Amino acid sequence: MRAMTERILVVGGGIAGLSCAAFLAPHAQVTLVEAEPILTYHTTGRSAALYTECFGDDALFRVAAASRSFLVDRAEPFGKVRPLLFVAPPEDAVALDDLEALYRSKVPGLERIDAEAVNALFPVVPPQRAAGGLVEPGAMDLDVHALVTEYAGLIRRSGGSIRMRARFAGVRKLDSGWEAQIDDEALEVDLVVNASGAWGNEVARGAGIDALPLEPLKRSAFTFDPGGDAHGWPFVIDVLERWYVKPEGAFALGSAASEIPSIPHDARPDEIDVALGIERITNATTLEIRSVKTQWAGLRTFTPDRRPAIGFEPGSDSFFWLVGQGGAGVLTSPAVGALAASLARGARLPEFLADAGVEPLAFDPARFRTPGTATSHPPAQPAIHRP
């Protein structure tokens, strides 16, 4: 285990950096820096934030399942129950079969329903437009603001520091650790945790570290008047993730669930992508979307195998990767934060992660340093992340 007095710099104030810093702060001197004036500005703060266990491959499923105890199984959960409904048009019945087979034995209460039951839950899909659906009754809307507040509070109560409008300008290697340049200030630290999302490779280059194969993907979303009371609707996702709809206050939120390759930037909504979302939703349902109330976009950053990179840069004991959460950042943040903190400290894997079968090697960034070790694109994942 590393020294208790270790000075750790976490670069990035998204949900990844916050959760990791929250678990590190009781054991080290933690400073989290964020270039923007508010936390979680670029991705987390634009999130549709659903808790679901129907997510990703087995490694991602395990960190999602492990996160339930922190997010849901508590006196005051970070959200409220909203079932998740995967809906398939008649021509995609096989895709629904495949999705059911993938999660049936893993997700408690997962239920296959017929077209009439789909219509009962989501009345804007007539029975003739659906082959059926798959319902996860234990899914939840997550309160991102409450979760961010909890992580920030844990950091500060443990003596950690959160610095806003603090731009990371690079580091210089010392005999032991780094001298980090934060705006005009030099800060000596023992360990750098790179939790910079779409900017992860820019931070790495500032430390003289080779880039990882990270790809920021832009997604646009919008709200609209559903023409009636949508409050009781589930979170509805097309089985092949071509669109999604969920209640959003007095309105409904929609998206084409697109993944448009992008550069790291303050993303803005794409008019064509918004129009595509409207077209897909209106073709699949009886909704008439005559106007858009609000629209926005954000970046979701992925590795080639769609698992985050969590671990030390091979050959370094002072540069730690925590990037590539993609659409799983919010819902996996307790498990991913605890995993990253334990690995960064050289500590034993927390019991709740071990009990869930979380395997740290599944997320080791070393898998991208050996040619041919990254796996292929996994099955479609729920569009839980706005955008």
Residue ranges of model-derived segments:
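N-terminal Rossmann-like FAD-binding beta1-loop-alpha1 element of flavoenzymes
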Residues: E6-T31
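Short hydrophobic core segments
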Residues: L9-V11, L187-W199, G337
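Active-site substrate-recognition segment that forms the wall
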Residues: A22-A25, Y51, E76-P83, S196-S318, ...
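Glycine-rich FAD pyrophosphate-binding loop
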Residues: A25-T44
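Dinucleotide-binding Rossmann-like beta1-alpha1 core, especially the glycine-rich loop
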Residues: A48-L121, R242-W243, R280
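Flavin (FAD/FMN) cofactor-binding and adjacent substrate-gating region
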Residues: D73, V87-S158, R163-M164, G170-S176
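Conserved beta-strand-loop-beta-strand element in the redox core of flavoprotein oxidoreductases
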Residues: A169-L187
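C-terminal catalytic lobe of FAD-dependent flavoproteins
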Residues: N283-P387
